[in-house]
Amino acid sequence: MARTRPFDVVLYGASGFVGRQTVRYFAEHAAGLRWAVAGRSQAKLDALRAEFIDAAPGVLVADAEDAAALDALAAQTRVVLSTAGPFARFGSELVAACVRHGTHYVDITGETPWVRRMIDLHHDAAAKSGTRIVPGCGFDSVPSDLGAWLVAKALWQQHDERCASVKACFSIRGGLNGGTAASMLNALDEGVQCQVDDPFLLNPAGTAPADAASHRDPAGALRDADFDAWLAPFVMGPINTRVVRRSAALLAADKLYTPDFRYQEYARMGRGATGALTATTVAIGMAAGRTALGFAPLRRAAARFVPAPGEGPSERAMDQGSFRCELVGVGERGSVQRGRIAGQGDPGNRATTIFVCESALALALDAKRLPGGARRGGVLTPCVAFGEVLAARLRGAGMTIEPFDT
């Protein structure tokens, strides 16, 4: 990639709710980098630049449907970080422009059917050119993907065993922003529920096992001895599990995972009778909600009760949030390896900002140390694209990331 491009990183969707947080993060953590804010509104971008005048970001205007403007944007930077969702509506042309110009790309999407389209359209071209297109670099799906990979890596290094299974248990405290809500509802509007339900939606062709149905998402409450708690299905599980399974398939040559590797994730609900009741209630509520949102009139009604795009929790609420992802991996001969990724701050906003910004900074600053070398490209997952480089950057940003023995 040409080093003469004017910018190292462009933040697309910078005036949105999460976008503004990425601007603040870059203003505080990207000294020495050449970066710019981008979006469709000149006035909003100028106001944003004035707010962060000391950081002196550049300003680029490009509508999400203007291929020529997006080509011009992609040609001016080495990395694009996009927070402009729903990505099925506002992301496709930008990804295409990045692939055409060999510009690395990260985003915060959880829209797996859209990611499948990007894989089908662009994986081969991006792989050929060494361009890293990395969707899902927010809370969806960095903790799951990086955590499962670190557990599998530790099993191999410490026990000389391939990883046969990993399960993850999430504890979260935080709110929903309008962009996330719009992305979730947009995915249902597109009539792609059968794709959402496919456990191996994101896998390369020919890598799904014959018993794919046995990997379907958990539906009920369960008592788990490893986590010593009652668990319910995790609302983001149908996103994160697909990403982890794609990682295992893409890394098959590394022999970290068994051919029949299994991954599932859950939400922690507590212990005893209260935990059992809560887990059962959540499981029933999720099933009922999913059925209800399958009807367009109910989706439109639900949209009136969630934040609008550009809105989200208060600064105080985001600061008081937190997340914890505990993982238990089992090796092919039965060895057990635990791991944990945790952090302070609302997971969908504060943590997502750290995840995606550090992913972009890894591309901009650590390209020579990334796994696979300069020639690795394609529509990748966070662990395949960044590996230990991202883990180290997240530790440096204050997150807890630690595989540990039982």
Show the residue positions of the predicted features:
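N-terminal Rossmann NAD(P)H-binding glycine-rich loop of SDR-like oxidoreductase domains
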Residues: 7-28
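Glycine-/Pro-rich loop/turn segments that contact NAD(P) or position catalytic residues
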Residues: 86-206, 246
